[in-house]
């Protein structure tokens, strides 16, 4: 059955996207399992224990008991390295890339961590994975801008579902607030998703007051060319009326 992978840089609204996929009820939804295997250790999924990313990726394309899978991952060097080495997974999965303006990523990260250790990750690494998917010769990768997702959730999710051949379920655009077992190990990163009941844009664009911070500006300068390149491929989402 199909494997639907969503890749994003940190702080790009990907957990809200994941929460919507859980709400559908028709997918085996996996929250950052590759990252967990790299940084925490063996992982149990569906009654099976996986020791490595390679084991998990092989299972995803070979045997998921006939169910469709949704996999959400934040792209960092270890995760990207394990995926680009698996050309079968690159070619057979349906890949989507959720992008966000680099200055917004940086401000959101810095507000939590007070550092920019993701300086060499971000949209640059996401772009590298996008190119690897293109070169694998499988399904064309999909790009969604998170700004479109919060500006017009119904249209954005309908366009995504059409692109990856999933039925659109309007009821999955809203959910009950609360923490979720899938992201319990990293819950402090997901407070916005946990307190939300749907896709909502922040009331103030610079809610952290960091738009002019030099670290934010440096990150934005580094990653904006890669964000803009990915923007060339993003789904055309109409503005909400």
Could you say what each language-model-derived stretch is?
Residues 4, 28-30, 69-71, 94-97, ...:
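Hydrophobic/aromatic beta-strand patches that form the interior of the parallel beta-sheet core
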Residues 43-48, 159, 183-190:
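Short, surface-exposed amphipathic charged segments that create phosphate/polyanion-binding patches used
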Residues 75-171:
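PAPS-dependent sulfotransferase catalytic domain
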Residues 37-39, 105, 178:
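Generic structural signal for helix capping and beta-alpha/helix-loop junctions
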């Amino acid at each position: 059955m199909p494997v639907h992978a969503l890749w994003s840089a940190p702080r790009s609204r990907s957990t809200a996207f994941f929460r919507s996929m859980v709400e559908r009820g028709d997918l085996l939804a996996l929250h950052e399992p590759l990252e967990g295997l790299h940084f925490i250790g063996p992982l149990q999924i569906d009654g099976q224990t996986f020791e490595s990313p390679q084991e998990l990726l092989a299972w995803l394309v070979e045997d998921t008991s006939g169910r469709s899978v949704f996999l959400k991952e934040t792209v960092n060097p270890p995760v990207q390295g394990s995926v680009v080495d698996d050309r079968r997974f690159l070619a057979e999965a349906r890949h989507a890339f959720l992008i966000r303006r680099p200055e917004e990523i940086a401000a959101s990260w810095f507000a939590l961590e007070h550092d920019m250790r993701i300086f060499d990750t971000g949209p640059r690494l996401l772009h590298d994975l996008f190119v690897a998917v293109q070169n694998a010769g499988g399904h064309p990768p999909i790009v969604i801008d998170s700004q479109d997702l919060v500006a017009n959730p119904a249209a954005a999710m309908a366009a995504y579902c059409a692109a990856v051949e999933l039925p659109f379920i309007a009821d999955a655009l809203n959910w009950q607030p609360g923490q979720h077992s899938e992201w319990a190990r990293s819950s402090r990163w997901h407070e916005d998703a946990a307190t939300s009941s749907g896709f909502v844009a922040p009331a103030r664009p610079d809610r952290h007051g960091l738009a002019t911070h030099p670290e934010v500006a440096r990150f934005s300068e580094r990653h904006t060319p890669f964000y803009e390149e990915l923007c060339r491929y993003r789904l055309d989402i109409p503005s909400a009326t």
